[in-house]
A protein has these predicted regions:
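Positively charged n-region of N-terminal signal peptides that target proteins for export
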Residues: 1-5
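Hydrophobic membrane-insertion alpha-helices, especially the h-region
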Residues: 10-14
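C-terminal motif of bacterial Sec signal peptides marking the signal peptidase cleavage site
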Residues: 17-21
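Short, non-transmembrane alpha-helical segments in secretory-pathway proteins
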Residues: 24-66, 130-173
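Exposed beta-strand-loop-beta-strand "reactive/processing" segments of non-cytosolic proteins
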Residues: 48-103, 166-216
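Cystatin/cathelin-like cysteine-protease inhibitor module
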Residues: 103-109
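Acidic/histidine-rich, surface-exposed loop or edge segments in extracytoplasmic proteins
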Residues: 109-137
Length: 216
């Protein structure tokens, strides 16, 4: 339940800037599943073929620009959402994708930590990071820099953008306690106006979630 509430919150935040430019038109569950699996396999370098699909609805308004917003004046409408989850055979969700039913747009995608496998080198890096005391803050700054670079490299490859702008979404924040692994979020802006919120994990350097804040 908590996971679903978190996902719905992320989608509501996305709606405030997300434009419903007509892409594929109204889609059904089968098409939502196809879109989600393609997205997961591309963005997370996975090879999934099976998923379950669940429908939900959220109330929205349109502002003066035509953007979807979750509060406003005038008549509201219900927008259908598809939640596609991989795999369907287990209660542990490895990947989850939220798709707008009216256009086929991906709003949000995430992966579970169970899908992450650290290399031996990354495990040693995590242990060294955890036990270090005197230079821990410097090590954390260095880790953050490497994580930002990983996000930049990912955006170049997956978002088809040669010069993405990567902004720190949690600028100045540091974990309150030492951790072997930690996550951090970045805003990624492309030259054609797309905006994403991308969550990364250190030391795997893997993307954990992608929120589409503004589409093409």
């Amino acid at each position: 339940m908590k996971r679903k509430l978190f996902l719905l919150t992320a989608i509501i935040l996305s709606f405030s800037l997300f434009l419903t430019a007509c892409k594929q038109g109204e889609i059904d569950e089968a098409k939502a599943k196809e879109i989600a699996l393609n997205y997961v396999n591309n963005m997370f370098d996975a090879n999934e073929t099976q998923a379950s699909v669940e429908q939900d609805q959220t109330e929205y308004y349109r502002d003066e620009t035509g953007a979807l917003v979750t509060s406003g004046d005038g008549n509201s409408s219900l927008e259908r959402l598809y939640f596609v989850r991989v795999p369907e055979e287990t209660s542990i969700i490895q990947y989850e994708v939220a798709i707008l039913g009216s256009t086929g747009e991906v709003l949000y995608a995430s992966r579970g930590t169970s899908s992450i496998r650290l290399t031996d080198a990354q495990k040693k890096q995590a242990e060294a990071f955890y036990v270090e005391t005197s230079e821990w803050e410097d090590l954390h700054v260095s880790a953050m820099q490497s994580l930002r670079q990983a996000c930049f490299d990912w955006a170049k490859t997956k978002l088809d953008e040669s010069r993405p702008v990567v902004l720190d979404a949690n600028r100045g924040e540091m974990p309150g306690v030492k951790q072997r692994q930690f996550g951090h979020s970045f805003y990624v802006v492309t030259r054609d106006g797309r905006v994403y919120s991308v969550s990364m994990q250190w030391p795997s350097m893997q993307v954990m979630s992608i929120e589409v804040i503004h589409a093409k």
